[in-house]
């Protein structure tokens, strides 16, 4: 039995936001005030695009015992995508003292595809395997205009203008085997991923190409004791990839006191997680305790440094490794048929080993 499905959509969409901030500024040097005033800021943000997207898929069932093959393909195009930001700083006389306008004009492609196979080889066991693909592409440019208080007009910042191209693709295959025997059950899996990333910019020295193949194993073991006591042990290795704006190598301004710049050399975070869980059902109530240890390599954090007078510059960096070890306790009490109470608590030790060096 085979089922096919398709869905197509197109339209125009976006979102906006605005904000107002009141400032009272006072500048001192060696205890002497040299600048003071009241200001208010008006910020506006707009993001819109014309988009077309579609999904096609199928589901083939070989029998009614869970033996099946499924697949899908998704494509989205965002054209004439414009991300616009403006900010103006006025004094108490309603005169503009600072201002900027920023345009990020681009088109975007998103592609996802998957093929998944499940084979129940016995009443309790199954094999799973599949292939997945993901790709995201942005191509566009970034422009900024700043306010000139002497000429009372905006001017283009040629030193900030930037063209960019970003493509991120992930090919992955995975396999899982799961089974149970009497009171024992297990699930073991492995995922192989090839990551391809291209970053191109008109800023000299900021082009990057990245290719890497990696494995991510996981293992889950469980044993059920008499009287509904259950013990679970698990291990997994995971990855957290940096967001695109973490890597964009050009300066953007969020307001007049905060600027940001991406780090094209930022690396992914890798997490190794070990857990041992005990669970007990007492009638309709449940109690559980989990002992865990988690380590993270190449921890990503936001760093802030001075940039210009009164302006800070934020960027992202891999600052080192962190570790957390502890216990989590939880309980669920079913007071009535329609009312239950959940209680949760944790106690852990957290450690960071900072390896980031500033030059």
PLM regions with names:
Residues 2-4, 64-69, 124-127, 183-186, ...:
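Repeated loop/turn-to-beta-strand initiation elements of outer-membrane beta-barrel proteins
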Residues 1, 10, 54-60, 113-119, ...:
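Residues on the lipid-exposed face of transmembrane beta-strands in outer-membrane beta-barrel proteins
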Residues 1-4, 10-28, 38-40, 52-56, 196-198, 227-273, 293-317, ...:
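Surface-exposed extracellular loop regions of Gram-negative outer-membrane beta-barrel proteins
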Residues 100-187, 222-226, 330, 357:
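Outer-membrane beta-barrel transmembrane domain signature of Gram-negative proteins
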Residues 101, 110-114, 157-162, 263, ...:
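Outer membrane beta-barrel strand-and-loop segments of large Gram-negative receptors
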Residues 10-16, 60, 75-81, 133-137, ...:
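Transmembrane beta-strands of outer-membrane beta-barrel pores
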């Amino acid at each position: 039995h085979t089922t096919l499905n398709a869905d197509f959509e197109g339209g125009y969409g976006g979102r906006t936001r605005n904000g107002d901030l009141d400032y009272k500024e006072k500048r001192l040097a060696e205890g002497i005030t040299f600048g003071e005033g009241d200001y208010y800021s008006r910020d506006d943000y707009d993001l819109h695009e014309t988009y077309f997207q579609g999904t096609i898929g199928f589901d083939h069932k070989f029998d009614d015992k869970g033996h099946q093959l499924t697949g899908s393909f998704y494509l989205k195009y965002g054209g004439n995508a414009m991300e616009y930001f403006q900010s103006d700083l006025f004094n108490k006389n309603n005169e503009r003292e600072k201002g900027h306008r920023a345009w990020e004009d681009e088109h975007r492609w998103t592609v996802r595809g998957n093929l998944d196979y499940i084979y129940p080889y016995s009443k309790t066991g199954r094999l799973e395997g599949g292939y997945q693909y993901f790709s995201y592409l942005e191509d566009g440019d970034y422009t900024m205009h700043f306010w000139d208080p002497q000429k009372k007009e905006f001017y283009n910042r040629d030193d900030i203008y930037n063209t960019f191209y970003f493509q991120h693709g992930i090919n992955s295959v995975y396999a899982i085997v799961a089974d149970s025997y009497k009171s024992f059950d297990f699930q073991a899996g492995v995922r192989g991923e090839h990551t391809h990333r291209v970053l191109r910019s008109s800023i000299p020295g900021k082009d990057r190409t990245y290719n890497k193949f990696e494995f991510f194993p996981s293992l889950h073991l469980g044993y059920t004791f008499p009287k509904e006591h259950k013990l679970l042990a698990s291990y997994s290795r995971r990855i957290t990839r940096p967001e695109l704006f973490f890597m964009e190598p050009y300066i953007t301004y969020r307001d007049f006191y905060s600027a940001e710049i991406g780090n094209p050399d930022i690396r992914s975070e890798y997490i190794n997680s070990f857990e041992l869980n005990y669970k007990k059902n007492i009638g309709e109530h449940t109690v559980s305790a989990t002992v865990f240890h988690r380590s993270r390599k190449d921890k990503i954090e936001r760093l802030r440094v001075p940039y210009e007078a009164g302006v800070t510059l934020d960027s992202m960096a891999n600052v080192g490794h962190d570790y957390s070890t502890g216990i989590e306790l939880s309980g669920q009490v079913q007071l009535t048929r329609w009312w239950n109470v959940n209680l949760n608590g944790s106690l852990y030790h957290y450690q960071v080993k900072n390896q980031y060096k500033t030059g």
